[in-house]
Amino acid sequence: MKGSPFEKVALSDVSFTIPSGSFTAIIGHTGSGKSTLAQHFNGLLRPSKGTVRLGELEITADQKPPSLKEIRRKVGLVFQYPEHQLFEETVEKDICFGPMNYGVSEARAKKRAKELLHLVGLPDTYLQASPFSLSGGQMRRVAIAGVLAMEPDVLVLDEPTAGLDPEGQRLIMDMFYRLHQEKELTTVLVTHNMSDAAKFADQIIVMSQGNVAMTGDRQTVFARADELVALGLDVPETLQLLLQVKERFGLHDVPPLFSLEELADFLAKELQQKEGQPCSKI
């Protein structure tokens, strides 16, 4: 409680810029403040001090509701387990709810719902189905379509793969990256999954105890592996393997590599140089 002995500052001295059109990952240990930070992006939480700026719009402690409504249209927030937010009788009604609440006509909202269902990888035959008759993964895609129906400029993903098996995680993240590219969205991924951050992000923000511990592109951040480990974070599996290979074979000046394909290419070239003969990928 503010002003009491039990007051706890969740975020302090946090300052950074997310470029328009970028894919930014916010990573941090449990309790680092990353999810609290994400909820400030669309005014779900307001700062007790300071300002959150979205283009020409601002969120402050005393921000008036009309501006917040516009901000919440521009910034779509996908929570953990977004399927828990489904409530309508049909998939179509659920996707249409947000746009119609903002004044979009029913006909236009229905057209948008059909297009978005395809975009998230579901057939339009699901439009009249109850969302509660679908599988967990399908329900999550419907919930995501509902967020996209607001046509946000910024998409904030708070641990969007929580509760999914590895294959489901891969499919959902590939879908988000495709949407990021096709819709030219500014995408913010809040995650503890270092492999997803390394694979998709242009920029990475590392949170620790409510502060920004480091920022930079993925090459810069993951080159500081020892510091990440000290913050209670892992490095991506590919980089872990790369560190083992460097130690085993005495390699130097190895750039950060973020996929098995990049690692295979690099090792093939290294072996070719060492042996002086062509070498196929391994």
UniProtKB/Swiss-Prot annotation:
Keywords: ATP-binding, Cell membrane, Membrane, Nucleotide-binding, Translocase, Transport. It comes from Halalkalibacterium halodurans (strain ATCC BAA-125 / DSM 18197 / FERM 7344 / JCM 9153 / C-125). Its EC number is 7.-.-.-. SUPFAM superfamilies: P-loop containing nucleoside triphosphate hydrolases. Forms a stable energy-coupling factor (ECF) transporter complex composed of 2 membrane-embedded substrate-binding proteins (S component), 2 ATP-binding proteins (A component) and 2 transmembrane proteins (T component). Residues 1-234 form the ABC transporter domain. GO terms for molecular function: ATP binding; ATP hydrolysis activity; ATPase-coupled transmembrane transporter activity. It is a peripheral membrane protein. Belongs to the ABC transporter superfamily. Energy-coupling factor EcfA family. SMART domains: AAA (SM00382). It is found in: Cell membrane. InterPro entries: AAA+_ATPase, ABC_transporter-like_ATP-bd, ABC_transporter-like_CS, ABC_transpr_CbiO/EcfA_su, ECF_ABC_transporter_ATP-bd, EcfA2, P-loop_NTPase. This is Energy-coupling factor transporter ATP-binding protein EcfA2. GO terms for cellular component: ATP-binding cassette (ABC) transporter complex. The keyword Cell membrane applies. Gene3D superfamilies: P-loop containing nucleotide triphosphate hydrolases. The keyword Nucleotide-binding applies. ATP binds at G28, H29, T30, G31, S32, G33, K34, S35. ATP-binding (A) component of a common energy-coupling factor (ECF) ABC-transporter complex. Unlike classic ABC transporters this ECF transporter provides the energy necessary to transport a number of different substrates.
